[in-house]
Design a protein with these regions (language model features):
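Short, polar/flexible loop-turn hinges at active-site or ligand-entry regions and domain interfaces
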Residues: 30-36, 123-124, 189-192
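Catalytic cores of nuclease domains that cleave nucleic-acid phosphodiester backbones
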Residues: 47-116, 123-130, 144-152
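Short amphipathic alpha-helical face segments that pack within enzyme cores
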Residues: 43, 130-138
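Short amphipathic alpha-helical segments and their helix-coil junctions
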Residues: 2-4, 20-32, 114-117, 179-189
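Nuclease catalytic cores
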Residues: 5-56, 81-82
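Metal-dependent nuclease catalytic regions and adjoining charged, substrate-binding loops involved
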Residues: 6-7, 80-82, 87-94, 100-101, ...
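Short coil/turn segments at secondary-structure boundaries
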Residues: 26-28, 36-38, 59-61, 76-83, ...
């Protein structure tokens, strides 16, 4: 079985939620059914990107709880859907999304210098702090002049905003934190299932060693 040699925040979250499901999705590549929540999220991100690119004149309805904020992003020239690819030495690979050396991939929904914004169509989860930290860590690595990074999460349905601030003094410890978690994922050979609150929605539960047949 071919191992997965690259990661993203969502991939790592999937593994830590359930290693068996991670194996099914990322290694065995068992096709996933269509998800209403995923489709909704992709649509909102596409609309936001096209508005910031000037292809849509006014913020569409799906963004209406943040109309003023989106107008300000556009006015200030925010970069939408900015992609970054790093190798396993945490070095930037320019235009490297499909590179054979790609180790970490991420996309920022919007950025103005050291101010980053992520758009969410779901609710707030504590794990979003880790996502914010990863974005800030990568931004510090690719922009050595940035010592402080502010990351905001805009929850498009509720209008809620979460703000996180990061400083370069923590970068070394943060990198060690990521490497420890990623090494565990990439060196796993067992992929043991982890029963959790999401099992009842899991599309591979019928073949799960724990949940199969339920």
């Amino acid at each position: 079985m071919t191992k997965h040699k690259s990661w993203s925040n969502s991939t790592l979250n999937l593994y830590e939620q359930c290693a068996f499901k991670y194996m099914c999705v990322k290694i065995a590549k068992i096709p996933q059914p269509e998800s209403h929540h995923l489709t909704k999220g992709l649509a909102a991100h596409s609309v936001a990107e096209n508005y910031l690119l000037g292809k849509i004149e006014e913020p569409p309805f799906v963004l209406n709880k943040f109309t003023k904020e989106f107008k300000k992003l556009k006015e200030l020239g925010a970069i939408p859907e900015e992609a970054f690819t790093l190798n396993n030495k945490w070095e930037l690979i320019p235009d490297g999304w499909r590179s054979k050396d790609a180790w970490l991939r991420l996309k920022l929904d919007a950025r103005i210098d050291n101010y980053l914004v992520d758009f969410k169509t779901g609710r707030h989860y504590d794990e979003h702090l880790n996502q914010a930290m990863l974005y800030a860590n990568v931004m510090m690595l690719v922009n050595p002049s940035y010592d402080d990074i502010e990351v905001e999460f805009w929850y498009l349905n509720s209008g809620q905003v979460k703000t996180y601030d990061f400083n370069r003094k923590n970068l070394k410890a943060d990198i060690e934190h990521w490497e420890e978690r990623v090494d565990k994922m990439m060196n796993d050979t067992v992929y043991a299932p982890t029963p959790n609150e999401y099992c009842k929605y899991c599309y591979v539960k019928n073949i799960c060693p724990v949940k199969g047949g339920e």
